[in-house]
Structures are given as structure tokens and as C-alpha cells.
């Protein structure tokens, strides 16, 4: 049995195949997922698993160089936004690198998901609870 925090074999496989600057998305239950993008659906019911739970486990396994958020999260989901910024700051300290954070419109965000290796769908049902994570290197 795998010893690490991430037990989901589909997510583990995607992360293991990421190259520098490849992207994966962690999305809420309502984010549209392009038909051409790998869909990893974790949603069981509203709120389960939560966006932050998925983010925390994925980032334990993935080296993150940069990230994209929909700019609408700032106004429409300020509590989640602040919590996410704090978690990104902790991740920077743990990884020993600065994570560039980019804000784009929600429409541009949805377009950008088409470039991602996979979209991980959480059960989160709060507005704009989505992030695109860009892979870094560990050396």
C-alpha cells in the first residue's frame, strides 16, 4: 500500500507524469470540464470532499511553480481566498520557492483548463473555488 498522503491512483499517476510548467486544475463541483481533458471526479455530495482538502493533499505530492485563480474569487469568496493565500504561503515555505500567482477572469480560467493535463473535481459548492497549478521542478 502507498505510504504517502495521496492514495488516489488517478491523481498520483497524473502528478507523476507532469513535466515543468504542465498544469492540473482543482475545481469546484460546478466547473465545466473540457471533453478532451482527463476528468478525475472526487465529488460525493455537496462539500465532500472540500476544495481545500483536495488542494492540501495534491500539493503534498506536487511541486508548484505558479498558479492561476479567477479574479472573481476575491470579491465573491473572500474567506476561501484568504485561506488559500495562507496555504500557498505555507507551501512556498515548505518547497523553498516563491509561487507566482496570476489572477484572470473566470472566462479566461475556463479556457485555460483546456491546456491542463487533468481536472480534479471536488465536491466544493462555494463560488470560484478553482485553481490551476503549474508544475515546477524539484532541483
UniProtKB/Swiss-Prot annotation:
Substrate binds at residues 28, 106, 128-130. It is an enzyme of class 5 (isomerase). GO terms for molecular function: D-ribose pyranase activity; intramolecular lyase activity; monosaccharide binding. Its EC number is 5.4.99.62. It comes from the Bacteria. Keywords: Carbohydrate metabolism, Cytoplasm, Isomerase. InterPro entries: D-ribose_pyranase, RbsD-like_sf, RbsD_FucU. The active site is at residue 20. It catalyses: beta-D-ribopyranose = beta-D-ribofuranose. One of its GO terms (biological process) is D-ribose catabolic process. Pathway: Carbohydrate metabolism; D-ribose degradation; D-ribose 5-phosphate from beta-D-ribopyranose: step 1/2. It holds the Pfam family RbsD_FucU. It is found in: Cytoplasm. One of its GO terms (cellular component) is cytosol. The keyword Cytoplasm applies. Catalyzes the interconversion of beta-pyran and beta-furan forms of D-ribose. Belongs to the RbsD / FucU family. RbsD subfamily. Homodecamer. This is D-ribose pyranase. It comes from Yersinia enterocolitica serotype O:8 / biotype 1B (strain NCTC 13174 / 8081). The lineage of its organism: Bacteria, Pseudomonadati, Pseudomonadota, Gammaproteobacteria, Enterobacterales. The gene is rbsD.
Amino acid at each position: 500500500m502507498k505510504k504517502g498522503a495521496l492514495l488516489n491512483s488517478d491523481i498520483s499517476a497524473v502528478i507523476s507524469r507532469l513535466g515543468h510548467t504542465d498544469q492540473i486544475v482543482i475545481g469546484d463541483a460546478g466547473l465545466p470540464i473540457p471533453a478532451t481533458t482527463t476528468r478525475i471526479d472526487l465529488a460525493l455530495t455537496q462539500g465532500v470532499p472540500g476544495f481545500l482538502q483536495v488542494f492540501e493533499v495534491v500539493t503534498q505530492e506536487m511541486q508548484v511553480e505558479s498558479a492561476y485563480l479567477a479574479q472573481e474569487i476575491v470579491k465573491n469568496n473572500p474567506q476561501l481566498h484568504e485561506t488559500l493565500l495562507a496555504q500557498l504561503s505555507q507551501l512556498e515555505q515548505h518547497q523553498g520557492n516563491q509561487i507566482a500567482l496570476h489572477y484572470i477572469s473566470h472566462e479566461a480560467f475556463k479556457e485555460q483548463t483546456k491546456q491542463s493535463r487533468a481536472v480534479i473535481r471536488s465536491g466544493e459548492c462555494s463560488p470560484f473555488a478553482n485553481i490551476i497549478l503549474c508544475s515546477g521542478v524539484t532541483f
